[in-house]
Amino acid sequence: MLPITNSLTYIIPILIAVAFLTLTERKILGYMQLRKGPNITGPYGLLQPIADGLKLFIKEPIRPLNTSPTLLILSPILALTTAMLIWTPIPMPHALTNLNLGLLSILAISSMAVNSTLWAGWASNSKYALIGSLRAVAQTISYEVTLGIILLSILILTGGFTMQLLTTTQKHIWLLTTSWPLTMMWFISTLAETNRAPFDLTEGESELVSGFNVEYAGGPFALFFLAEYTNIISMNLLTCIMFINPGPTQHPELFLINLVTKTLLLSLTFLWIRASYPRFRYDQLMHLLWKQFLPLTMALCLLQASLLVSISGIPPLP
């Protein structure tokens, strides 16, 4: 009974946070476009995400005739499962599983999520969905390269792979202050990794064909939607832990308040960017990564590694 209770107390708060992030996004976009946003369902529109979720899950799932039924259903389930698994090593202030290679496991699980996008495009048996999924996979895999190198740079600085060590390292000074170019590139790469504006080429909502999920409706579409917003929150949580010190570990209640506040501010920045910037062209997206971010992150990674080696060679003061 206890493992089931633990799992529920771990999953339910994430799903509630995701539900209200969608409402926050619609409200922020509304006010930035000089309108109200959802304000009818419940007080101040607070019940809107619950109504939307119910509507999507009670709709009949439409399956085109030529699709691969097993893969079509498995893809959204895999997307949400991998999005949830990313949260297991994250300390809030205690992790669900205290892994020795916590940061690497997060990177590995997020890489697995690419399979769900590819499967969805393939199973739809539609050329538009397949082209959309290939484009999405190319974007996600490309930006994982810079995320991996930035992660390696941070590991070189902290000297370990655990999340707790990152918190201890930033006790006196944030890594944002010492590695701000890496932080900026990490933040922009997380935008691309989670398919958010101005990099939302994976699911161009304003386009005639939205992307890999063009054949999805109802419940399976809702699972993809939940996975996307879960990834947004988890990436911002990771950014907070890596660069802007989530808080004092000796005071668990302060740690949680600090972590949630900083993550919320980063998530609001994501929404603000969506309301402010137009979509990039695909060639600009790839040019930014392969010709600008990649050489710069590699140079900074080598600089940090060489600095540590050179400083360790300096004899101690008498």
UniProtKB/Swiss-Prot annotation:
Gene Ontology process terms (BP): aerobic respiration
Localisation per UniProt entry: Mitochondrion inner membrane
Pfam families reported for this sequence: NADHdh (PF00146)
Transmembrane segments: 1-21, 71-91, 101-121, 145-165, 172-192, 224-244, 253-273, 294-314
Keyword NAD: yes
Domain of life: Eukaryota
This protein's record includes keyword Protein transport: no
Its membrane topology: Multi-pass membrane protein
UniProt entry keywords in alphabetical sequence: Electron transport, Membrane, Mitochondrion, Mitochondrion inner membrane, NAD, Respiratory chain, Translocase, Transmembrane, Transmembrane helix, Transport, Ubiquinone
GO molecular function: NADH dehydrogenase (ubiquinone) activity
UniProt xrefs under InterPro entries: NADH_UbQ_OxRdtase_su1/FPO, NADH_UbQ_OxRdtase_su1_CS
Enzyme class label: translocase
Family the entry assigns: Belongs to the complex I subunit 1 family.
Functional description taken from the UniProt entry: Core subunit of the mitochondrial membrane respiratory chain NADH dehydrogenase (Complex I) that is believed to belong to the minimal assembly required for catalysis. Complex I functions in the transfer of electrons from NADH to the respiratory chain. The immediate electron acceptor for the enzyme is believed to be ubiquinone.
HAMAP family linked to this entry: NDH1_NuoH (MF_01350)
Protein name stated in the entry: NADH-ubiquinone oxidoreductase chain 1
Protein's gene: MT-ND1
